[in-house]
């Protein structure tokens, strides 16, 4: 099992990144809550990973800390929640918001996440409420700054396209993704800033 990668960040295409370790490039999918904290392309990164083996693919999911990964593993233990849905859940809101929503049995907030209907939200609450006690939600994710570091400033059109693509990868519908990105877009925003504002507006 691959549990940790330390190497050079080669590419960032939310929610996926490419990291080179000893000459080998690893494709890693990462929740946006973690993605915002990545260093610039060309810099060293340390990523804690969850390795998934399927019949048709081998996938890596990445996190900045061991505790973030542990929360992801708790989320995907819930009945009907796989890694892709877990990625969307932890991208659609911060860890603190997720833990609080589960503890408060806030179904109306959970159903706003991509791929989460009422039944899934209810299962998350029932199955995870006791398991999440004492997690210290405020420490799970480091708060992201408003200015996401980027190596080069993309054009507005490119940034919006990248943001829409990222939302689609997280499970949002095309019309919803395009609409919300257009609503939050402002001149000079990077794709990561657009994604963050779009996700905020939908929860």
Swiss-Prot record:
InterPro entries: DNA_helicase_Holl-junc_RuvA_I, Hlx-hairpin-Hlx_DNA-bd_motif, NA-bd_OB-fold, RuvA, RuvA_2-like, RuvA_C, RuvA_C_sf. Residues 155-203 are annotated as: Domain III. One of its GO terms (cellular component) is cytoplasm. It comes from the Bacteria. The RuvA-RuvB-RuvC complex processes Holliday junction (HJ) DNA during genetic recombination and DNA repair, while the RuvA-RuvB complex plays an important role in the rescue of blocked DNA replication forks via replication fork reversal (RFR). RuvA specifically binds to HJ cruciform DNA, conferring on it an open structure. The RuvB hexamer acts as an ATP-dependent pump, pulling dsDNA into and through the RuvAB complex. HJ branch migration allows RuvC to scan DNA until it finds its consensus sequence, where it cleaves and resolves the cruciform DNA. Has three domains with a flexible linker between the domains II and III and assumes an 'L' shape. Domain III is highly mobile and contacts RuvB. This is Holliday junction branch migration complex subunit RuvA. It comes from Vibrio atlanticus (strain LGP32).
